[in-house]
Curated annotation (Swiss-Prot):
Orotate binds at S124. Disulfide bonds: none annotated. Keywords: Glycosyltransferase, Magnesium, Pyrimidine biosynthesis, Transferase. Gene3D superfamilies: 3.40.50.2020. Its EC number is 2.4.2.10. It comes from the Bacteria. Catalyzes the transfer of a ribosyl phosphate group from 5-phosphoribose 1-diphosphate to orotate, leading to the formation of orotidine monophosphate (OMP). It comes from Bacillus cereus (strain G9842). PROSITE patterns: PUR_PYR_PR_TRANSFER. 5-phospho-alpha-D-ribose 1-diphosphate binds at R94, K98, H100, E120, D121, L122, I123, S124, T125, G126, G127, S128. One of its GO terms (molecular function) is magnesium ion binding. GO terms for biological process: 'de novo' UMP biosynthetic process; pyrimidine nucleobase biosynthetic process. This is Orotate phosphoribosyltransferase. Pathway: Pyrimidine metabolism; UMP biosynthesis via de novo pathway; UMP from orotate: step 1/2.
Amino acid sequence: MKKEIASHLLEIGAVFLQPNDPFTWSSGMKSPIYCDNRLTLSYPKVRQAIAAGLEELIKEHFPTVEVIAGTATAGIAHAAWVSDRMDLPMCYVRSKAKGHGKGNQIEGKAEKGQKVVVVEDLISTGGSAITCVEALREAGCEVLGIVSIFTYELESGKEKLEAANVASYSLSDYSALTEVAAEKGMIGQAETKKLQEWRKNPADEAWITA
């Protein structure tokens, strides 16, 4: 499944690999990869494959789930499709409470004691997903874990998720993506080496000249 989803993401341009012309993330870090999973919304067959895959992950790892929660905003649509497939209630969680109206951070019903799985589009450092998990825990929910479309497999992300004591599973990952890109002839050996070096230590820009 990992390579199938990776292939979909590459084909629709949801993921770009530019090891020779790095992107600059909002954090200022140079990166050979940029992921925009919002593009999956525009491709019915791709989003259906993602919804089916996320459902499979949830049934395998979190079979007692009672509520599906999407992260705002990128996880909302995927959470809705998954909850519909599983015939479960759905809510979504903002990064912070609204400054008007009821001031809700959680929209929809997620009640105390309910078992919740969070749906996220992308795991990089894990920050937005963890914010969602913490809000649900504060509301008294039992968060079983997180499922996502893609992960960069960054050590910093893994460490933050472990520190937050939350399990996380992704449909596809950086390793599968680079492998598929190489198989498709989208990157050569030199580019593959740069991509591998970046993942080892993203903060060290030595990978750019690797």
